[in-house]
Design a protein with these regions (language model features):
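Flavin (primarily FAD) cofactor-binding/catalytic cores of flavoenzymes
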Residues: 1-117, 127-218
Length: 218
């Protein structure tokens, strides 16, 4: 990228060039890695998106998945569909799993102006009141979050910087499991694996990963 008067000149790997008034780097999230300082010995690791690596895990091996978000769900389903019989342990700081979608509905917009005028604590109280009212009316709580979906940017930008940081420290994990949900069928599969003692979800912080003499890890 070369900055020029009135714009930017981008040279591609092919040698072709583009001229743009503004350049936005939208490269997505980089893959998260376990810090090398916490790895001891020849530890075998597989990225959740390394399908060949996941498929190569022995069917009877015990598996530990770091993180309990949507990527974890994909990894567990890949193992289960591949006939994995070993126990799967999931470790995350809070041990929270994505919640399930409800049947579609509740498309009317939320009265977002009422939220925009409030601070973070009062917003949380109002959203909780809405979910209680929805339950009392026979509606699933998921509809409340679906109504908020179109207003995510406005809600975020209307918070002060201090409140944004407070949200990231204390609430984002709970927001994520309510907002980024999974299909009911997937939730049923995970529940069945947990009931069958094949899937265990643990809350904790990873301190180290050490290769064992039997090929396992601790």
């Amino acid at each position: 990228i070369q900055r020029r008067a009135g714009g930017n000149l981008l040279t591609l790997a092919s040698g072709a060039t583009l001229v743009a008034r503004a350049v936005v780097l939208a490269v997505g999230n980089t893959p998260r890695r376990i810090p090398a300082a916490r790895l001891r010995g020849a530890v075998r690791l597989a990225d959740a998106w390394d399908y060949d690596g996941v498929a190569a895990i022995p069917a009877d091996a015990d598996v530990c998945i770091i993180g309990s978000g949507l990527s974890m769900v994909d990894a567990v389903l890949s193992l289960d569909h591949g006939g994995h019989r070993g126990r799967i342990r999931v470790l995350s700081r809070h041990g929270l799993m994505p919640l399930a979608h409800a049947v579609s509905g509740g498309a009317d917009n939320a009265p977002v102006d009422a939220l925009l005028a409030l601070g973070l604590r009062d917003r949380l109280r109002l959203v909780r009141a809405w979910t209680r009212a929805a339950n009392a009316a026979g509606e699933p709580w998921q509809w409340v979050f679906d109504r908020l979906r179109p207003h995510g940017q406005a809600l975020w930008r209307s918070l002060t910087h201090v409140e944004q940081q407070r949200f990231l420290r204390h609430l984002v994990r709970y927001w994520d499991i309510h907002r980024h949900r999974i299909a009911p069928q997937v939730a049923h599969t995970l529940a069945a694996l947990r009931a069958g003692d094949r899937l265990e979800v643990l809350a904790g912080r990873l301190q180290s990963v050490e290769a064992g003499g039997d090929g396992g890890i601790t």
